[in-house]
A protein has these predicted regions:
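Glycine-rich phosphate-binding loop signature in dinucleotide/nucleotide-binding domains
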Residues: 4-8, 138-141
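Active-site clefts of carbohydrate-active enzymes
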Residues: 150-155
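Active-site beta-strand/loop signature of hydrolases that rely on acidic residues for catalysis
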Residues: 1, 9-24, 56, 145, ...
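Short, well-ordered alpha-helices that flank and scaffold nucleotide-derived cofactor binding pockets
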Residues: 2-3, 39
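Extended active-site neighborhood of metal-dependent phosphoesterases/phosphodiesterases
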Residues: 21-143, 158-170
Length: 171
């Protein structure tokens, strides 16, 4: 992996969530920060690459706000909110807007087990849908791409996310 990383020019890394197994991080002092992120991605050619982070269901098992707080102290961990967007300039004629979504609050299986997902019920799903609608409507970007933990459509083992097909039909 280090040989590959040494020969590739990377502008940023985008995650699709489940940043920390099995139950997310608990706080800023959680050893998972060091053991599974800081020490793993410490190679000279990748340690300063920005990480644009999405949240997954395993992140909701922990303190997802610790990941937001971590971003305030570590500028390469970018997570200003549970969902957000960022515009990347491709060239003088094109740009790309990536919408980083928090899809876990839309999955009914998780909402029906709040003991496993303590922060999930605090998330305002309608506010995220409204934000998404407004952001896409107002976007002048050449391309808009949404990234989230759960795919709307998938040929993978978990299949489609039916809740997302109903709630986020424009995706």
């Amino acid at each position: 992996r280090s040989k590959i990383a040494a020969n590739v020019s990377i502008d940023f890394i985008a995650t699709t969530g489940d940043n920390f197994y099995m139950k997310g991080v608990q706080n800023l002092e959680d050893p998972l920060w060091e053991n599974t992120f800081e020490n793993i991605y410490a190679l000279p050619n990748i340690k300063n690459i920005p990480w644009h982070v999405s949240l997954g269901n395993h992140d909701h098992m922990g303190n997802l706000y610790a990941q937001i707080d971590y971003a305030k102290e570590h500028p390469n961990w970018i997570l200003p909110n549970t969902y957000y967007s960022k515009v990347f300039k491709i060239n003088e004629n094109a740009d790309l807007r990536i919408l980083f979504l928090d899809t876990s609050p839309f999955i009914e299986e998780y909402r029906s087990t709040p003991d496993y997902y303590p922060n999930l019920m605090k998330q305002d799903r309608q506010a995220q849908v409204q934000w998404l609608d407004n952001t896409l409507s107002d976007s002048n970007s050449t391309w808009n791409i949404a990234i989230g933990h759960h795919p709307v459509y998938s040929a993978g083992a978990h299949g489609d996310s039916e809740e997302l097909k109903d709630i986020l039909p424009e995706l």
